[in-house]
């Protein structure tokens, strides 16, 4: 009786809490981001749920990464897993499609047209009318179970559901098994896409009796069986012709060892009450959304905010089963202990804003994320970079699980871990930072990543430096001074790629690459250009300002960032969207930049710019995101900015104040306290802070701290249409991120080219500027000395070769150089290699190569330096959408017996071998005779990056050799870039 009384009281309390919550679901539009390039999906998910049940309207292409695009007119069916806002495609598992009449397993035949006017998308619920069948499809879910409700027309036509396991990704293996007695179908699907071996089991049950199941393998019907297996398995499930409605519940398991193991997850839905599951999902969403309450009369702003908050609560996804079992990175099944395990960690995006937001309002899940990271380290030897369903995709850069761990530690989330466990976290950080890949060895050796060793070298250097700062701070907190000293030095390596203008500038062969255009999007940056990456020094920004020349210079650079032309050059990069000047809000590298004015005493400019971004680049419409949602990062930026502050440097516990968007916002903290933010006089035109109070006391700092928030309080702003240029300005009022120099900046070896005919003169300089006035810099620095060698030995202070001026060489030479400072010691040693080659022939190019892929100029094809398999390192001339044609002049008539040309194929990157190469020879450059033809034998859909030499061996006498290579042409339908023009990549022409 007592237990019953307690249960009744608990139910009453739950009901009271539910009634007390505001119905915030009504303000969410899951269709936001499904148009333009947002890459979101509109279907049903519960907060951070392991099932994402949503319609699939697109099978291929970049804008089909989530399987749904608002511009599409047909639905192929409803699959149970989807990615939100990613730039790569995966998931779309276990597709169901209801039908009436004649059924087919061919997707072009069973798909149906639909109309957005008959479509409803809400948190935890989706419905649409399938025009072809006149069937109403409704979807809802629990964390592990997708629930469908199909309402059929009242006729006597055949009715049923198509199950398609071939849908979208390459299938490695699949099984469909029918248990007639249990009215149940179970199966599995192993597939390959972004995750090269994703495993998923399913168990589905039906509210109506199955009358018949037809099995299909390779789209051919297989009779008299109850189960099928293969790489193309489908089934047609029939119900009675008078069936009016069917509810289907589909449980998923990524940990299953046996075919029926997903059954245990069906416990979440013990019956077929669709309404109850829908109501539960709705309440779960209201509970999450009520963590932040906003007050405003602007309904549009309220919709934008709560849709953004909704997207923040969709990923990462729950990965373990109801019993805690999950599949690890080692492919084995493990048991989670006192935590949940999650998947889909888009950390290059989400460490910036999503994880800091969750560390503030969802400490329990943040703890689970750190627990998950450590399981990855135990099972895979490293912390995750971009993990997807127990698979490290190696997508994007950095080791950004580290700032998530450090930020959690700073906020006390990891206090319950033992000292030993925290030390293991530090060990995991160090091990991940020192992996022998992705330019990390070169970064440690040279103090930056040379672009001729690793692509995206500038971005990687900058992001590694920030992550290393996080490692250093964590080591310091744990009393590990040796680790601190090592990584605090590494965190200043950004200085080694900074040029005189303050731009982060790629370096190769010991010096800065030239020509250089900060607007050029190229392989030295990750989905960006130098404008968008140059201010990325969040942990030491004020030192960066000093090196640039002071606050006045920094202000001009920031003003130019937002005020210059939005035109970019170089590679077409679909991710670079939402441009304001060269600031690209549609991608992550510059998300912090609008807040940097606070660091130089101009917070009113931050207020103006953040308000402009919020109002111009976010709406409540399907195209309401200006770029990929990126698993919550794009929305988290908005949520935090609407609060009025943003974590420029995750882990330092500072929030940089921008412009609060709402009249009142209440953050309901997990400890029961509330942090309330008010903005008196706020309107769409009044974005400027006039004054502020924190807990009733005058507040004139342009930042707040975690300690100001964690126990609740009030932050009250008074807003105006005019800026108060004095508020938040002053040494003690503005944020400052700087620490003492602990490294000596490396020198730069400067030469006009790497190869030469007779002699070459190079110089060596230090590129650290010295400020002599507010506007003038002396270059190079005069406080350091440079030592160098030209015989390949390591330079040292006692070397006789202290650099004093230009040096001329006449032979192949390896130059090594080091700079020295009395306070900070030696810099890392850098090196450059120069080659003398016999210029016994010249080349005339009849095709124009892409500016991005010049390999150093016209003579690159004759310089004796061959391009590598990784085309991003340079060394290849690229020709897009055209044939390659050139004429070689041997300078005299000669006997030859061999002509060879090197070509590259990297199909994923649109680089495909030419279909053929034709060579002609001539003595007078007028009358040419055929020399030979080479026909390509490698398939275009061979995705292995490879180099082939097209060679023709035949005696001939000539002076001129004309070479023509035929382009593959337009990329076919099977390619992700279908319809685009392929590239020819060529390097090194040999004549013997």
Predicted regions and their residues:
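Beta-strand signatures of extracellular beta-sandwich domains
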Residues: 691-693, 785-789, 918-920
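Short acidic/polar inter-strand loop motif in beta-rich domains
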Residues: 723-726, 822-826, 967-974
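Short, compositionally stereotyped local motifs that mark structural "simplifiers"
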Residues: 20, 737-884
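Bacterial Sec-dependent N-terminal signal peptides
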Residues: 1-21
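Accessory carbohydrate-recognition regions in carbohydrate-active enzymes
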Residues: 21-355, 359-403, 409-462, 470, ...
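Aromatic, loop-rich ligand-recognition surfaces of beta-strand-rich domains
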Residues: 868-932, 944-992
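Extracellular Ig-like/FN3 beta-sandwich strand-entry sites
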Residues: 245, 712, 810-814, 958-960
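Exposed aromatic-hydrophobic patches
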Residues: 235-238, 804-809, 945-953
């Amino acid at each position: 009786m007592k237990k019953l009384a307690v249960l009744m009281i608990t139910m009453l309390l739950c009901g009271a809490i539910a009634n007390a919550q505001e119905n915030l679901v009504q303000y969410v539009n899951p269709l936001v981001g499904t148009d333009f390039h947002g890459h979101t999906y509109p279907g049903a998910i519960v907060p951070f749920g392991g099932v994402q049940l949503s319609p699939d309207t697109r099978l291929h292409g970049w804008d089909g990464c989530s399987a749904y695009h608002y511009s599409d007119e047909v639905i192929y069916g409803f699959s149970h897993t989807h990615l939100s806002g990613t730039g790569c495609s995966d998931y779309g598992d276990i597709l169901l499609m209801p039908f009436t009449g004649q059924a087919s397993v061919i997707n072009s035949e069973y798909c149906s047209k639909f109309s957005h006017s008959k479509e409803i998308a809400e948190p935890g619920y989706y419905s649409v009318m399938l025009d072809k069948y006149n069937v109403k499809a409704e979807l809802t879910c629990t964390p592990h179970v997708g629930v469908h409700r199909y309402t059929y027309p009242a006729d006597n036509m055949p009715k049923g559901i198509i199950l398609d396991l071939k849908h979208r990704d390459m299938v490695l293996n699949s099984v469909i098994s029918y248990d007639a007695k249990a009215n149940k179908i179970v199966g599995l699907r192993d597939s390959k896409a972004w995750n090269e071996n994703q495993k998923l089991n399913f168990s589905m049950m039906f509210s109506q009796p199955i009358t018949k199941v037809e099995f299909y393998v390779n789209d051919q019907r297989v009779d008299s069986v109850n189960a099928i297996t293969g790489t193309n398995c489908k089934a047609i499930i029939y119900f009675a012709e008078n069936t009016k409605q069917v509810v289907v519940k589909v449980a998923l398991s990524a940990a299953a060892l046996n075919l029926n193991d997903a059954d245990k997850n069906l416990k979440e839905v013990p019956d077929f009450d669709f309404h109850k599951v829908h109501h539960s999902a709705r309440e779960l969403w209201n509970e999450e959304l009520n963590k932040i309450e906003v007050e405003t009369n602007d309904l549009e702003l309220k919709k934008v905010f709560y849709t953004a908050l909704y997207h923040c609560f969709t990923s990462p996804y729950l990965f373990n089963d109801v019993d805690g079992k999950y599949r690890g990175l080692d492919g084995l099944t493990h048991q989670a202990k006192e935590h949940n395990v999650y998947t889909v960690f888009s950390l290059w995006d989400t460490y910036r804003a999503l994880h800091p937001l969750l560390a503030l309002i969802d400490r329990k899940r943040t703890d689970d994320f750190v627990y998950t990271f450590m399981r990855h380290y135990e099972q895979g030897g490293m912390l995750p970079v971009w993990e997807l369903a127990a698979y490290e995709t190696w997508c994007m850069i950095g080791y950004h699980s580290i700032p998530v761990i450090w930020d959690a530690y700073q906020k006390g989330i990891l206090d319950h871990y033992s000292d030993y466990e925290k030390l293991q976290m530090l060990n995991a950080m160090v091990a991940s930072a020192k992996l022998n890949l992705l330019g990390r060895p070169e970064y440690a050796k040279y103090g930056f990543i040379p672009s001729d060793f690793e692509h995206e070298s500038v971005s990687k250097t900058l992001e590694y430096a920030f992550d290393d700062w996080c490692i250093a701070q964590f080591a310091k907190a744990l009393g590990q001074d040796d680790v601190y000293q090592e990584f605090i030095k590494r965190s200043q390596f950004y200085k080694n790629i900074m040029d005189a203008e303050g731009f982060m500038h790629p370096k190769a062969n010991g010096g800065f690459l030239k020509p250089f255009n900060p607007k050029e999007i190229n392989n030295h940056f990750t989905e960006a250009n130098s404008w968008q990456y140059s201010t990325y020094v969040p942990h030491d920004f004020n030192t960066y300002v000093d090196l640039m020349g002071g606050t006045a210079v920094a202000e001009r650079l920031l003003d130019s960032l937002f005020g210059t032309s939005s035109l970019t050059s170089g590679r077409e990069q679909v991710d670079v969207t939402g441009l304001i000047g060269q600031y690209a809000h549609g991608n992550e590298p510059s998300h912090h930049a609008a807040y940097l004015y606070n660091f130089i005493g101009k917070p009113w400019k931050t207020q103006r710019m953040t308000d402009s971004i919020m109002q111009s680049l976010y709406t409540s419409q399907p195209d309401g995101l200006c770029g990929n949602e990126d698993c919550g990062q794009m929305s988290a930026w908005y949520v935090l900015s609407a609060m009025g502050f943003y974590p420029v440097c995750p882990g330092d516990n500072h929030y940089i104040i921008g412009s609060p968007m709402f009249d009142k916002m209440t953050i309901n903290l997990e400890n029961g306290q509330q942090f309330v933010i008010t903005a008196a006089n706020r309107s769409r035109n009044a974005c400027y802070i006039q004054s502020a109070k924190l807990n009733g006391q005058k507040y004139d700092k342009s930042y707040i701290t975690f300690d100001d928030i964690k126990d609740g309080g009030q932050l009250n702003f008074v807003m105006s249409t005019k800026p108060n240029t004095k508020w938040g300005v002053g040494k003690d009022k503005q944020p400052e991120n700087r620490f003492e120099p602990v490294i000596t900046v490396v020198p730069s070896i400067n030469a006009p080219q790497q190869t030469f005919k007779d002699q070459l003169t190079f110089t060596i300089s230090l590129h650290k500027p010295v400020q002599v006035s507010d506007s003038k810099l002396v270059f190079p620095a005069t406080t350091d000395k440079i030592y160098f060698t030209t015989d390949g030995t390591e330079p040292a202070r006692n070397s006789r070769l202290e650099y004093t001026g230009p040096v001329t060489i006449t032979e192949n030479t390896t130059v090594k150089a080091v700079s020295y400072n009395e306070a900070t010691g030696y810099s890392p040693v850098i090196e450059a290699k120069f080659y003398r080659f016999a210029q016994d022939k010249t080349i005339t190019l009849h095709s124009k190569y892409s500016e991005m892929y010049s390999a150093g100029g016209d003579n690159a094809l004759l310089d004796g330096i061959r391009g590598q398999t990784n085309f991003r390192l340079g060394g290849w001339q690229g020709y897009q959408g055209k044939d390659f044609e050139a004429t070689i002049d041997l300078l005299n008539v000669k006997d030859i017996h061999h002509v060879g040309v090197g070509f590259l194929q990297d199909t994923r990157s649109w680089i495909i071998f030419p279909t053929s190469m034709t060579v002609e020879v001539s003595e007078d450059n007028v009358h040419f005779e055929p020399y030979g033809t080479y026909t390509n034998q490698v398939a275009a859909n061979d995705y292995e990056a490879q180099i082939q030499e097209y060679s023709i061996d035949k005696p001939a006498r000539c002076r001129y050799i004309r070479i023509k290579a035929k382009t593959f042409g337009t990329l076919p339908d099977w390619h992700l870039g279908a319809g685009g023009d392929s590239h020819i990549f060529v390097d090194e022409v040999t004549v013997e």
